[in-house]
Regions:
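Helix-to-beta-strand junctions that scaffold the AdoMet/dcAdoMet cofactor pocket
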Residues: 117-118, 131-133
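Conserved Class I S-adenosyl-L-methionine
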Residues: 47-49, 173-189, 193-276
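Class I SAM-dependent methyltransferase Rossmann-like catalytic core
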Residues: 3-20
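A short acidic, Gly/Pro-enriched loop at the edge of an enzyme's catalytic core
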Residues: 97-108
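Class I SAM-dependent methyltransferase SAM/SAH-binding core
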Residues: 39-99
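A short SAM/SAH-binding and catalytic strip from SAM-dependent methyltransferases
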Residues: 107-120, 143
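Conserved alpha-helix/loop element of class I SAM-dependent methyltransferases that forms part
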Residues: 17-38, 53
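Conserved catalytic/acceptor-binding region of the Class I
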Residues: 121, 128, 136-209, 233
Length: 276
């Protein structure tokens, strides 16, 4: 049985500016919410740095961030409490694979989390059902899993040296996304839509700084299952990281102004029809 990946909030936040930009782009496509004040759920909230942005857009909202990682929730506590606009921000433990709302929400949103949840598209009907009339379901997932950073990770996990320890999916088990057309098809089947689902993709051409920045990036996300699997063997962990680092250096050579790291992301926004 695979151990659940452990998370390091500080490592994840090392590239917070690049990781946060897609959420701003997602928020820009969300219409005003029906509730006064609105009730909002953030699925897979991580350390809370993105969740707090919801209170900037809707200052009087009651926002709850849900995550399955105790370490991430502990980091998120620094944002918890009453908000300047008269709303409230709190956090709770929940696994997105099983979370079913116990109340009505005006917005259910998820940023860069559902790729870890196998079959997450099957959860859409239950989440949508718990939207208020005029409410919105919106999410963003990485769509970068065929890029060198992720493909090389999977290939290395399946190499003879690592296959017995890592070849059962530790390097690839997070690839649970659909292509944009797949999300459009699933969301279009939801009842009572206000309009056609808004689904799109964007490739962010990022310039990362520092030594081996792509390796540093993946340590916060894609490498987490591998690092968890090798946590009790520091020598093996170091050897794996050295091999992966060398592959990444060839795939993403450093330039005079940094390392170019393109990253594709997939977005979707769907709105329920308001009561007439």
């Amino acid at each position: 049985m695979q151990a659940a990946a452990t998370w390091d909030p500080q490592q994840y936040l090392r590239h917070a500016t690049h990781r946060t930009r897609p959420f701003h782009d997602l928020l820009a496509r969300i219409s005003e919410l029906p509730g006064h004040p609105p009730r909002i759920a953030d699925i897979g909230c991580g350390p809370g740095n993105v969740t707090v942005l919801l209170t900037h857009r809707w200052p009087d909202a009651h926002v709850t961030g849900y995550d399955s990682s105790p370490d991430m929730l502990e980091a998120a506590k620094s944002y918890e409490g009453a908000t300047p606009g008269g709303g409230r921000l709190d956090f709770a433990h929940a696994d997105a694979a099983h979370w079913t709302p116990d109340q009505t929400y005006d917005l259910i949103v998820s940023n860069a989390a559902l790729q870890w949840v196998q079959g997450h598209a099957d959860r859409f009907p239950a989440w949508y059902e718990h939207l208020a009339p005029g409410g919105t379901l919106a999410f963003q997932v990485p769509g970068n899993f065929t890029s060198p950073s992720h493909a090389l990770l999977g290939e290395l996990c399946d190499a003879p040296q690592w296959r017995d320890r890592l070849g059962d999916g530790h390097g690839r088990r997070f690839i649970h996304i659909l292509e944009p057309a797949g999300y459009l098809e699933r969301l279009s089947g939801l009842p009572g839509l206000a309009d056609e689902p808004d689904v799109w993709k964007t490739t962010y051409v990022q310039l990362l700084q520092g030594e081996d920045p792509v390796l540093d990036w993946t340590k916060g996300t894609a490498l987490r299952p591998v690092l968890t699997a090798l946590a009790d063997d520091s020598a093996a962990r170091g050897e794996f990281l050295a091999q992966y680092r060398d592959l990444l250096r060839k795939a993403y050579p450093a330039g005079p102004r940094g390392t170019v790291f393109p990253f594709r992301r997939i977005f979707a926004v769907v709105r329920k029809k308001a009561v007439q």
